[in-house]
């Protein structure tokens, strides 16, 4: 982030092409850092920094576009060589081949020698006029940029980013999200081959590249050259498209022959770059396949998505240890109820995961105050972007279940539930009933209820006469008995449990009884008692 302030000083000197480019690159990297951290750290400074960087970045964009077109004119239609001058360095490289960070190298303006091509000369003169105008706009934008605030962020935000180790699984999951989005843009661009599609693809690759660069050092070392080259190829395609559109709009061609000559040259350069991109990104050995191989696979995707959401919740929840305990207790209840046949789901694993996430996130709303926090939790969870590996309705279910961990009981007429299909409504209320009771078991946030168990249930299959058999279902109308380790009758926790078990009783259509869990007696001690008695 300090590099942005350094580049601001360079740009303020003369607003030439290289420092403007370097400042925009620095801003883009900071914005990409913020974009990645926002997914796991809800601190508002990330969003504020990203917004401030975006404002300056965009206001420098028009100037940068003009300067790029001037460089391309020099490359495509160079001035006639003079006998007393060697080849201009500016003509020996494309704009995208220049270094992204100049490391203090002297800044050089594009060569403005007279061109033999009248169209090139006229277009360059028009662009020089625009450059002067855009430099005034850029100077105003730079003056409005709050460097003092940026310096404060440069001290505080890197410390927050350091809490998550670079190269960790959560960053690989974030990179996979960017890879997936960019890959879809790649397929679309190769299918319709439009200018907009290739430009959007370049942006997608750029976002993937900066996540890798900022957060995955090992992958960056292996992939950086290829990622930058693919981005540069597509960037040059976009530059050529903009140059051609500008030349047409400015009516710089003196005749049809000149227009056709320009079009043919631009089309040739454009096609060559697209073909090179295709060669490296299509087929079983493509770069896309190589990049995907280094990112999470299979079940790792959903597990890492859960870890990302836990990190997000931990930053918001003032007592996340309580939420973790509630999650464990809720899963104990869920597994026991399924084992005795009182709950049945078409997709039991998904329902269990929904309950786990709802329990972990149920108190994130307390970041904005305790009053009505269950409603705030619902809004925060629902407003969170859907992590890769989860379906959108999966996160919405978790948000609704978390909404009803306290406050009013869920009903079909509630505005949050009225649009749910009958099966989804039933599942959501069942999970909310479990979470509500699990939360009551840790009502005082002290963790003295260590575990719970459905009496006479066995979460595994029992072996009888050499055969595995499922546990017997509870008979109709028989009370559900829950044993809780550390439960004390008459305590504050017992009162909370008595109040919150009602929803589960309604769902199961049977009474729920909670009692203290009996201490297990080791087998050896029991045998010793028998010998003494005899």
Features from the language model and the residues they span:
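Amphipathic, well-packed alpha-helical segments that form the structural scaffold of globular domains
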Residues: 2-9, 180-183, 187, 310, ...
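Cationic, histidine-enriched alpha-helical/coil surfaces that engage anionic ligands
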Residues: 1-304
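A short amphipathic beta-strand at an alpha->beta junction
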Residues: 508-523, 531
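Regulatory/sensor and coupling segments of signal-transduction and defense proteins
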Residues: 300-314, 318-321, 325-330
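Divalent metal-dependent catalytic cores for phosphoryl transfer on phosphate-bearing substrates
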Residues: 313, 322, 334-454
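Low-complexity, glycine/alanine/valine/leucine- and proline-rich hydrophobic stretches
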Residues: 444, 448-457, 476-512
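Short hinge/gating elements
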Residues: 208, 307-317, 414-425, 485-488
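Intrinsic, low-complexity polybasic segments
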Residues: 85-89, 94, 102-105, 459-466, ...
């Amino acid at each position: 982030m300090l590099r942005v302030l350094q580049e601001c000083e360079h740009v303020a000197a003369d607003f030439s092409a290289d420092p403007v480019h370097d400042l925009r690159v620095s801003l883009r990297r900071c914005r990409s850092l913020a974009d990645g951290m926002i997914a796991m750290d809800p601190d508002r400074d990330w969003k504020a920094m990203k917004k401030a960087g975006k404002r300056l970045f965009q206001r420098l964009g028009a100037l940068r576009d003009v300067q790029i077109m001037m460089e391309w004119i020099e490359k495509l239609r160079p001035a006639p060589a003079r006998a007393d001058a060697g080849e201009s360095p500016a003509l020996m490289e494309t704009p995208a081949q220049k270094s992204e960070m100049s490391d203090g190298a002297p800044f050089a303006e594009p060569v403005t020698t007279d061109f033999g091509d009248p169209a090139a000369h006229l277009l360059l003169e028009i662009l020089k006029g625009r450059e002067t105008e855009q430099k005034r706009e850029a100077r105003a934008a730079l003056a409005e940029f709050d460097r003092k605030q940026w310096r404060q962020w440069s001290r505080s935000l890197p410390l927050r980013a350091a809490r998550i180790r670079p190269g960790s699984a959560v960053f690989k999951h974030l990179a996979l999200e960017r890879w997936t989005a960019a890959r879809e843009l790649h397929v679309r661009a190769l299918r319709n081959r439009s200018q907009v599609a290739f430009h959007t693809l370049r942006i997608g690759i750029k976002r993937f590249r900066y996540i890798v660069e900022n957060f995955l050092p090992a992958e960056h070392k292996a992939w950086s050259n290829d990622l930058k080259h693919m981005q540069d190829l597509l960037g040059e395609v976009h530059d050529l498209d903009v140059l051609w559109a500008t030349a047409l709009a400015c009516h710089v061609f003196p005749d049809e022959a000149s227009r056709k000559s320009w079009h043919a040259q631009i089309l040739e350069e454009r096609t060559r770059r697209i073909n090179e991109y295709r060669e490296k990104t299509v087929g079983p050995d493509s770069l896309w396949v190589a990049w995907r191989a280094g990112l999470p696979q299979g079940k790792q995707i959903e597990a890492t998505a859960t870890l990302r959401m836990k990190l997000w919740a931990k930053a918001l929840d003032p007592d996340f240890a309580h939420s973790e305990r509630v999650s464990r207790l809720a899963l104990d209840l869920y597994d026991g109820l399924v084992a005795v046949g009182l709950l049945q789901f078409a997709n039991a694993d998904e329902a269990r995961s929904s309950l786990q996430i709802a329990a972990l996130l149920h108190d994130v709303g307390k970041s904005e105050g305790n009053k009505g926090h269950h409603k705030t939790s619902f809004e925060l969870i629902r407003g969170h972007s859907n992590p890769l590996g989860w379906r959108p309705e999966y996160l919405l279910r978790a948000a609704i279940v978390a909404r009803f961990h306290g406050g009013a009981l869920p009903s079909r007429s509630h505005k949050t539930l009225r649009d749910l299909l009958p099966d989804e409504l039933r599942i959501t209320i069942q999970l909310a009933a479990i979470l509500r009771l699990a939360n009551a078991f840790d009502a005082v946030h002290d963790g003295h209820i260590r575990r719970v168990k459905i009496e006479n249930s066995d979460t595994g299959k029992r072996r009888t006469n050499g055969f595995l058999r499922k546990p017997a279902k509870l008979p109709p109308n028989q009370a559900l008995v829950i044993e809780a380790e550390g439960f004390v009758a008459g305590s504050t926790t017992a009162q909370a449990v008595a109040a919150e078990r009602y929803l589960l009783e309604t769902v199961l259509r049977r009474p729920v009884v909670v009692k203290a869990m009996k201490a297990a007696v080791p087998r050896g001690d029991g045998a010793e008692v028998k010998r003494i008695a005899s």
